[in-house]
Amino acid sequence: MMLLGSPSSGGYGGKFAGASPAGGTTTMAPSAKQPSSRAPPPGITGGRNDLRILSPAAAAAAVGGLEMKKPEAEGIAESLQATHRKELEASIRKQLQGVELSPSPYDTAWVAMVPLRGSSHNPSFPQCVDWILENQWDDGSWSIDGSISTANKDVLSSTLACVLALNKWNVGREHIRRGLSFIGRNFSIAMDDQAVAPIGFGITFPAMLTLANGSGLEVPVRQNDIDSLNHLREMKIQREAGNHSRGRKAYMAYLAEGFGNLLEWDEIMMFQRKNGSLFNCPSSTAGALANYHDDKALQYLQSLVNKFDGVVPTLYPLNIYCQLSMVDALENMGISQYFASEIKSILDMTYSSWLGRDEEIMLDVTTCAMAFRLLRMNGYDVSSDELSHVAGASGFRDSLQGYLNDRKSVLEVYKTSKHSISENDLILDSIGSWSGSLLKEMLCSNGIQGTPGREEIEFALKYPFYSTLERLVHRKNIVLFDAKGSQMLKTECMPVHDSQDFLALAVDDFCISQSNYQNELNYLESWVKDNRLDQLHFARQKITYCYLSGAATTFRPEMGYARTSWARTAWLTAVIDDLFDVGGLEQEQENLLALMEKWEEPGEDEYYSEDVKIVFQALYNTVNEIGAKASALQGHDVTKYLVDVWLHVVRCMKVEAEWQRSQHLPTFEEYMESGMVSLGQGATVMSALFLIGEKLPEGVVELEEYDEMFRLMGTCGRLLNDIRGIEREESDGKMTNGVSLLVHASGGSMSVDEAKTEVMKRIDASRRKLLSLVVGEQEGPIPRPCKQLFWKMCKILHLFYYQTDGFSSPKEMVSAVDAVIKEPLQLRSL
């Protein structure tokens, strides 16, 4: 920004005594001299362009903010994927290494108004006064982003605060005149109940108007309008006069500059943090310091003014929250793998702060919940005990975010509550209960109708993280991503990291992946035909859904062979299940098992039927091919493990077929011993296990930990299948179902619904235990990426059987297939 007009009294930093001692390193976004075109200061994103991404080429053109014809766009796509992609990664990597904060005119103004102790006619922070003089926009306003020409309540509030600061020290008469003129021209916005408002605007803005009138300033607005705002302010205060909750007191302390002498300062200072601030907020701290001298509060403001060269952000410190938010964004959009070392450094530092109970984490509900979730899912040992203060709704309401009913905070704690790794985690379960109820109430509010926030809440409630596919989540987050990334607090808080870099890389990566997925799916469809599997009249033709489960989890470009191996194995398990369940004769089933036990190329006369020939040849050739590839990668024989797991699956299928033919009802325990294997997930996971780039020791599948993960995953899969398929199976005359067996074993004392409830408890316990094994001890013979395959399969099963048997219901998975594989991205905005 440039200095507008000569100051009336020369150099203000030199005029005022009491400047703070120099020191600190500047990490604030630099302020440029203001051009007349209102260009934004460096580091601040400008306007938005509506986009529709149709291809990698179109993605490149759109991310560049250009409208181009296809050939030109194709050329840009090639450039993005080669040079620009590296530049994007380098830019993001740099941003992860340090957080740069945007300046806050509102907070800087309140700090500028703090008088020098013992000299009420001089400011404690003349540097802030200078910054205000040098950073007015040419329309008379002060705001975080002058490129946004439309005034809003935040800009009005910031401008009035800056006017008050200049008037307090009797400088910048022309700046004051132009600021008041801006307020007068746009005052109707302050009267608009529907306009987005900063937190506490109804308290602080009328209070500033009163302060302006009391100091002799003539605000060019009707007195009736000022009286109306003051009346509304008084009504707000009176309405809450009987509320003595801690949450209310926190709110009043947060708005210390707006409540002023209405506050009991000894009580307000109970919210002071170790660094001397109130809520890490400069304006709150300055508001308190103007009425109640405190050395620690003064030192906090001095440190900020020195660190940022005369300007302050709206929150500080904010490093942990900002860095975790970036990590979360990278994970949510599917590009975290490119920044593994940087993310590890951030999480290591966060974990150290967690163990030290750093106030930046522990005193902020959102940061605490996000830190817990990211640390847990990345293998750090964190306890939900640190969330005990919000275990109940009353505890949350006692916080500032709770009093404000902050949507982001509620959503964050709700998502975190689903990351339990113990059967009876009362804290997380309680958080999930009250936060889920609160989110449902928010859905009924008109305030979030038609907003991305509503879609976020709906998605979180419908699909807990354990019933989602990664690539579906990535697409959803890319589409909903806010490239501006600002947050409205008392004033707008805008990160200076270039969120458009995140979005551009994610779009490029997703579009490239879709192209790969389409090619791989074409190969799989040819594989089905080449192996004559489409000629099996009894088999469900679901190769696309089988591929979806692989593509949406092992999604990285280099894992193409693992994806197709996963899909082919999953499809073969479905085909053979159909052979044993509905489509095959007993002789065909026995013949197939006998051929598998020999595991060699049979003669033509060894096949009982053409169907058996088609199935066995496809299985034999596919398993041997995958085994040879995996053995070469691992340096030892893997084929034997694949054959063994297939034999285990088919033997269990045969046992269940014999139960059905003889109308034998096994015990629930007998059924589960077979059922957790016969669904075939173990074979599917193993088909990719040796192909994802991790070295596994010989005999890994014989380890107790492997067997336990197999059992837990299989338990979830079988029981989820049984809950969703019981009505269909009973109508088909099939009695071997976990739900019906529990009802039978109860002797009539348990209803079907009660049995389903019991089964869901067992699923929940197994899922939590599985997650504990996946995110637990990092050392051991089974690398975490391999453990994660079991977890990802568990998530797939939860999604497929979320409401119905998705695998058996033709329309259930169509939208997921389209979103991951077929439909081009459509972005709302950049």
UniProtKB/Swiss-Prot annotation:
Mg(2+) 1 binds at residues 577, 581. It is an enzyme of class 4 (lyase). Residues 23-37 have a biased composition (Polar residues). Expressed in roots and stems. One of its GO terms (molecular function) is terpene synthase activity. PANTHER family: ENT-COPALYL DIPHOSPHATE SYNTHASE, CHLOROPLASTIC, ENT-KAUR-16-ENE SYNTHASE, CHLOROPLASTIC. Belongs to the terpene synthase family. This is Ent-cassa-12,15-diene synthase. It comes from Oryza sativa subsp. indica. The lineage of its organism: Eukaryota, Viridiplantae, Streptophyta, Embryophyta, Tracheophyta.
